[in-house]
Each structure stands twice: as structure tokens, then as C-alpha cells.
A protein has these predicted regions:
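Surface-exposed, charge/polar-rich loops and edge strands
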Residues: 1-357
Length: 357
């Protein structure tokens, strides 16, 4: 029954709280004595990205200084709200992005000349390094620089962010005399400059051709795209280009001029594919709920698309990755990114930094 599972869930959240407290008591987690920022560097396959670990303001989120590009699901939020609320802590940071700033970049470069506080390679081969910035001048320089940045974007972690904000609002209700400086007014984040971020493509695989033969399907595709065969796997090299795998053959698709759009959402490659192929030809109206389509993160490679087509699918599309600039443009326009349009890699590690409130 749902009542029994609610009790079970409460026990799970309580267990998380107890384990966190034990880890604090036994010195696994150490509370910082001074006001500091941390520089957090992740290296994957020789590519490095460096962010700043900080707390973001729930007011900035509510006032849209922190911009979103995805709707959240209430059920996914509730789980995270309960977890954060029961633990009185955020253990997984929100992945935020901003337009690169010279002052912040200089402070980060300076910090990286020191010895890191942490340096380890995780089991998945991703290298994590952390430096601390605690000198008063540097902390103030970074704080002032961020104060002047009026657009910050959620790259990944919309559910975590929405949940952290809702817990903060709960605490405000419980403490009507709040000043706005209490820790519950802030949530744990890592902020990355746009130029450091890598978005990987999110590829598509489809279960059937909606009653069309391969020939009929290709004929219809040719109305909107130029199509040429390829003897090797196709990873698109530019926007407006798509790889297609069908009948054990790869093709390069290039969108014709008339289906391109300058609209921040309709102009995205994932939207071009959805609006000109998936919906009209294959009858996939809502890719979020349609069981005939599946999504494969770019990290898994093109061989995975071939494997799926040998297995439970008949058709695959390899995408050109969405750029961070495209994501910013969608968020700036107050619009939503289409489902499964960005795959951020590497993922931030949970439990490395914890924000208690």
C-alpha cells in the first residue's frame, strides 16, 4: 500500500540523515572554519573543465537571475525535497553555467598554482581535483564579480534546484523572522564558465518505420534533407547535419534550407529532426512518453546505435551536439529545451561538497 511505502521512504530519508551525521561526527566530513570558495576541476579523456563551488541564492532562482530551460516533474521533486529537508543538507550540487568572466578566470588560474586539497581518480576514470580559495581579497574579488553577472543558467540539475528552493521556502515559512542570510536561503552549486563546458549529443533510436518500407522512408526524408550514403559511421560535423543508420547502412542527412529556423527552439537540431521526421513520418508526437523512441547518451558511442538496431530498433539518428550558446538563447527567451537535447559529461560528484543549513 502507499501508506506502507511512505513509512518506508521516511525511514530511507531518516537513514540518509543518520549516516550523514555519523560521517560528520567521525570526521569523514569536516566543517570549514573560514569563508571560502573551492575550485573544482574534472578531467575526462584528457579534457578538463573547472568550476567554482559556491552557494547560489534561492531569490536569484525565484527572480530568474538563475535561468531554467526545463520543466520539472512533481514526483521527482518530492523525493529530493524530502531528502534535502530530512538531512538539512544538500549533498549533490546544481550544475550552473555563466558567460566567462576575466576576474573569476584569473582567480581560478591563481588558485590552481597551489597544491590541491584533494586529487583523486574515481573508479570511472574521471580525475577530480579541488583547491581552496580563502584569502579575503580573492573571496571578495570573486563575490563582486558574480554580483555583476545577471544571468546564470542551470546546465543540469533542474529537479535538484527546484527542490532546494522549495525546502528553503518551507524554512522561511517556519521562520517568519528570517533575514535572508540564513543558510537555508542558499543551495549548493558548481558554476562553470561557458567556454569550459562540453555538451555531448543525445542520439535517437526508433523501434519501427510506422508502416513504411525503407525505400518509402528514404524517399520521404529526401523531401526535407539531402541524403548521401556513407561507408563509415557518421558523427555529424556541423549543425544541421545528422547521421542515420537504417538497414545496416549509414547515411549523412543535411537539412534543406527551408526547414531551418532562426527561432531559438525550432532552430535546434533536435527540433528539426522532431518536426520534420519523427512526428510527420514516424508518428512520434511526444518523444517524452512515446515508447517507440529511445535516447542514447553520446558518451556511449555510435556502435551502441548499431547494436540497438541489431536488437530492438530499426532506425537510429546520430546528432550534432547542442552548443551552450544555443542553450543560453533558449533560456534567455524564457523557453524550454526539447526533451533529451543535452548530455553533460563529466557529471559532478555527489558527496564531495555538502551544504548544511
Amino acid at each position: 500500500s502507499s501508506a506502507a511505502s511512505d513509512v518506508y521512504k521516511r525511514q530511507v530519508y531518516k537513514k540518509a540523515h543518520d549516516m550523514l551525521m555519523e560521517a560528520i561526527d567521525d570526521g569523514t566530513f569536516i566543517t570549514d572554519k573560514d569563508k571560502a570558495y573551492y575550485v573544482y576541476e574534472l578531467t575526462m579523456d584528457g579534457r578538463t573543465q573547472t568550476g567554482i563551488v559556491a552557494c547560489a541564492s534561492i531569490d536569484d532562482y525565484l527572480n530568474n537571475v538563475i535561468k531554467k530551460h526545463e520543466n520539472t516533474r512533481a514526483d521527482k521533486e518530492l523525493d529530493r525535497i524530502n531528502h534535502v529537508d530530512t538531512c538539512s543538507a544538500q549533498t549533490g550540487p546544481i550544475f550552473l553555467a555563466y558567460r566567462a568572466n576575466a576576474v573569476i578566470s584569473a582567480e581560478v588560474a591563481k588558485a590552481k598554482q597551489e597544491k590541491p586539497v584533494y586529487s583523486f581518480t574515481a573508479v570511472d576514470g574521471i580525475r577530480h581535483k579541488v583547491w581552496k580559495i580563502s584569502s579575503k581579497e580573492s573571496v571578495e574579488a570573486i563575490e563582486n564579480a558574480f554580483a555583476g553577472i545577471n544571468q546564470i543558467y542551470i546546465a543540469d540539475g533542474h529537479h535538484r534546484a527546484a527542490s532546494a528552493v522549495k525546502v528553503g521556502l518551507r524554512r522561511r515559512e517556519a521562520n517568519p523572522g528570517y533575514t535572508g542570510n540564513e543558510e537555508f536561503n542558499y543551495f549548493l552549486s558548481v558554476l562553470f564558465p561557458d567556454e569550459e563546458l562540453m555538451i555531448m549529443p543525445y542520439n535517437r533510436v526508433v523501434k519501427d518505420l510506422n508502416g513504411l518500407s525503407e525505400e518509402e522512408f528514404i524517399t520521404k526524408i529526401k523531401e526535407k534533407f539531402t541524403v548521401s550514403g556513407s561507408s563509415t559511421q557518421v558523427a555529424p560535423s556541423k549543425k544541421g547535419e545528422f547521421g542515420m543508420y537504417l538497414g545496416k547502412k549509414w547515411y549523412i542527412l543535411t537539412a534543406k534550407e527551408e526547414i531551418l529556423s532562426s527561432d531559438p527552439v525550432d532552430g535546434l537540431d533536435v527540433a528539426v529532426l522532431q518536426n520534420n521526421v519523427l512526428e510527420p513520418l514516424l508518428g512520434i508526437h511526444d518523444p517524452k512518453t512515446d515508447k517507440r523512441i529511445d535516447f542514447v547518451g553520446g558518451i556511449r558511442g555510435l556502435g551502441e546505435l548499431e547494436r540497438r538496431c541489431d536488437n530492438d530498433c530499426v532506425l537510429a539518428f546520430s546528432m550534432y551536439a547542442t552548443s551552450i550558446g544555443e542553450l543560453f538563447a533558449v533560456a534567455d527567451a524564457g523557453l524550454l529545451m526539447p526533451p533529451k537535447s543535452t548530455w553533460f559529461e563529466p557529471k559532478l560528484r555527489s558527496g564531495l561538497f555538502i551544504h548544511r543549513f
